[in-house]
């Protein structure tokens, strides 16, 4: 079995694109529509990487990152944040929360896989 990744995004279109790209590359992919749903899933299933949108209802990507970093099981798990914002202050906030990487939307499949391969070596 390949490495497992959770894709967290309130846009079902974005989740499907991320999931398709990663599954095509041999990863096992779980999906969640927001940070709260992701936390519930991650209590029952461990993953090797978290890819999360920043702007979501209930629990946004930065809040999700902070919550995961406070849990022993996810204190070192790579977390990539996705956003339409290229604001340096937002990037700094994400990194301070514990994000490992950052992808600005829109992005293509090659860009996604390059970042995933960088933070999650084979």
Predicted regions and their residues:
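Active-site residues of response regulator receiver
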Residues: 53, 83
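Short, glycine/charged-rich "phosphate-handling" switch motifs in NTP-dependent
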Residues: 100
């Amino acid at each position: 079995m390949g490495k497992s990744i959770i894709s967290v995004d309130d846009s079902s279109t974005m989740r499907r694109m991320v999931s398709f790209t990663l599954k095509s590359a041999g990863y096992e992919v779980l999906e969640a529509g927001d940070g709260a749903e992701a936390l519930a899933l991650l209590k029952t299933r461990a993953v090797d990487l978290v890819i999360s949108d920043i702007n979501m209802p209930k629990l946004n990507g930065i809040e999700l990152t902070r919550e995961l970093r406070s849990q022993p099981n996810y204190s070192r798990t790579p977390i990539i944040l996705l956003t339409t914002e290229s604001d340096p202050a937002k990037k700094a906030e994400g990194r301070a929360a514990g994000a490992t990487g950052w992808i600005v939307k829109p992005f293509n499949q090659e860009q996604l896989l390059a970042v995933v391969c960088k933070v999650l070596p084979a």
